[in-house]
Amino acid sequence: MKFLIIDGYPEKSRLQFDTVGMTLAGKLYEKMLFQHIPDAETTILYASDNSTLLPNLEVLKTFDGILWPGCNLTVYHDDDERVQRMIEIVDLAFEAGIPQFGSCWAAQIAVYVAGGKVALNPKGREMGVARKIYLTDTGKSHPMYEGKPPVFDGFISHDDEITVMPEGATILASNDFTSIQAVDVAYKNGSFWATQYHPEYDLKEMARLIVARADKLTSEGYFNSQDDMMNYINILETIANEPNRKDLRWMAGIDDDLLKDNIRQLEFVNWLKFEMLNDK
């Protein structure tokens, strides 16, 4: 099966991720895909780069599915050519009926292209771990959440949120910080399943992302100092390397829904099962 992975992070952001030792967003999705379909064929498209040629409709149709990692652009910045390039891809994929899946920015761009709205979350940034995500009544019976606990935590990093859902879209999950944590968007000839949180992240990658966002997080009051931040990072990375550290897991509030791939990645696995392998 052939998958197109759209990494929308600008080159400057990708270089920063390299500097802090974080895996690039497109590569993270590729890694997650290979865990479940080892022989998958992948193409990673760096869509924000001016040198990258966008696929037309006929090229898109050569792919079985399209994957959307997170991105640090803003979907409602209509004057940003990089955003418009990716809006065009989403719309073409809907038109072609190619199944799409993604996280964070993916949920926002799926809703936005279908006619919904996205805005800055008045509560500010939801960072690190999204606590007590719960399935809506629709989510409890949706195939994306087959086998998922009704309440769980997820890795997260965003300050925008979906505010208005378009016709043909459903809310699958929510929490107290962000009312729309997962969506199923049916539009034109296609569907797009997406989470606001990140099934593809693990504890190490989230720790590295916090390092990449160090200045913002400190200025926004998440840490009193860089030293406080590094103490927290050390706890997270120790848990990643020693997952049986009960003391540190208790201190940081890290449970199996964050540590175990078979729980954390279940939304993606179910998308593969029901949308790609047609187990309907």
What residue ranges belong to the model's regions?
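A glycine-centered loop/beta-turn motif at secondary-structure junctions
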Residues: 180-226, 232-241, 245, 253
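Cysteine-nucleophile active-site neighborhood
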Residues: 71-139
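N-terminal beta1-alpha1 cap of cysteine-dependent amidohydrolase-like domains
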Residues: 1-96, 220-280
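Short, glycine/charged-enriched secondary-structure capping and boundary segments
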Residues: 18-21, 80-83, 114-118, 169-170, ...
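Pocket-forming structural segment of enzyme catalytic cores
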Residues: 8, 116-209
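Short glycine-/acidic-enriched loop or helix-start segments at secondary-structure transitions
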Residues: 15-16, 77-79, 111-113, 166, ...
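A structural signal for short, well-ordered beta-strand segments and their strand-loop junctions
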Residues: 5, 42-44, 101-103, 173, ...
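Structural motif
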Residues: 58, 93, 102, 163-164, ...
